[in-house]
Amino acid sequence: MNNTAHSMSEKVLLVASLEAARYGQYQQAVKGLQAESGLLETHMIDRITDLAYAPPADYFDAVYMMLPSEGVEWAAALPKLRASMIPGAKLRVSVVNENDPSSFLSQVRAELTIAGFTDIQTYENASIESRRPASSSVAEKDSTASSGMGAVKLRRKPNENGGHQQKKALLWATQPETHMDTEAKLQEHARTVSPASRREDCTVDFSAPRTRRKRACKGCTCGLRELEEEDERNSNLVQLDPSEVGGTGGKRTEVTTTVKGPNGEEHTVRRIQVDTRGATSSCGSCFLGDAFRCSSCPYLGLPAFEPGQKVEIPANMDDDL
């Protein structure tokens, strides 16, 4: 490694590798630099690439590197070394024990260019030398002059009043704010019943919450089906049978008996005997159901039917409403 003479006031950094120490090149370089420079600092390449290490900024006048052709983290080492060098300082890289250093020097040349070094020169003794730019402002000035063009900042065109265009007001920002509670409107509509659907003598409270009994599903396993079957066995049926009609003038007679259903289960039945043939109706709508009957109608509570038709009503029918 051919070293350039240094003054005793210059600070020099030597970065080497284990290969350079194995072949004795590192020890020879240390002796030569100690005799020529005032202050010599030595580090292995692993120390430089360590993320925890940061060399002093703008400190060294020259940096020498003795490295192998492979296994060097240039992207981590060169930026640190460049920051530790004073402007205009030189960096010299030498390859250790390489038979064909041309490919190595080409790689190092590219890495030095990427790191921002200038004045890169290659020597026959398998070494390459470069320098840190003297000033970043000078480099920028030179690049601008060489291209013959400079960046021109574009200005916004002013309007007729001499000022910049004003932002247009949003259309919805000029309208008054209106708040509508959709949920409250829906609840109010559900509670309100139109007058056309209510009769004068209707006593049903439509504002009260309605309940619906849950029915057992097809594959019920929670016991609800057993409860329904028990309720069905104990339920009362209301039958209107024209063959058992007795009395006159629409009179109504109730008889409670126990009968067996088609499946052999017993049911308590309340029979209501009504003479529909003798009943009179001023409205003619008594047989259409409770919605068309007066409050004093003798058929109030019975479903819609025709004279002579058999009707059966479970006593717990109101659970489904």
Swiss-Prot record:
Keyword Iron-sulfur among record annotations: yes
Transmembrane stretches, start-end: none
Subcellular location: Cytoplasm; Mitochondrion intermembrane space
Region annotation (Fe-S binding site B) ranges: 283-297
Keywords linked to the UniProt accession: 2Fe-2S, 4Fe-4S, Cytoplasm, Iron, Iron-sulfur, Metal-binding, Mitochondrion
Domain notes: The C-terminal domain binds 2 Fe-S clusters but is otherwise mostly in an intrinsically disordered conformation. The N-terminal domain has structural similarity with S-adenosyl-L-methionine-dependent methyltransferases, but does not bind S-adenosyl-L-methionine. It is required for correct assembly of the 2 Fe-S clusters.
Subunit note: Monomer. Interacts with TAH18. Interacts with MIA40.
Family per similarity comment: Belongs to the anamorsin family.
Protein name: Fe-S cluster assembly protein DRE2
